[in-house]
């Protein structure tokens, strides 16, 4: 079992949360003007880097609010959580990522 820190409710079991994709991706100003290729790129083409990644999560089994998290994709460790609409926090990674 892993605990995820909800910025509204505190630490909760991972089974209460649902993943929502990459965070800080700008929604197209007018999606109706996009070609199918452009729309599919917006929907499906995301970075898949190893290391710290900004993600969207929803506390579906609790407050039902969306929030963002910085998670290490190599270790699955959550490094920071912050409310939707807040800027991405800076992480102090001097001396390693742990």
UniProtKB/Swiss-Prot annotation:
It catalyses: sarcosine + (6S)-5,6,7,8-tetrahydrofolate + O2 = (6R)-5,10-methylene-5,6,7,8-tetrahydrofolate + glycine + H2O2; sarcosine + O2 + H2O = formaldehyde + glycine + H2O2. GO terms for molecular function: metal ion binding; sarcosine oxidase activity. It is found in: Cytoplasm. The keyword Metal-binding applies. The keyword Flavoprotein does not apply. Coiled coil: none annotated. Heterotetramer composed of subunits alpha (SoxA), beta (SoxB), gamma (SoxG) and delta (SoxD). This is Sarcosine oxidase subunit delta.
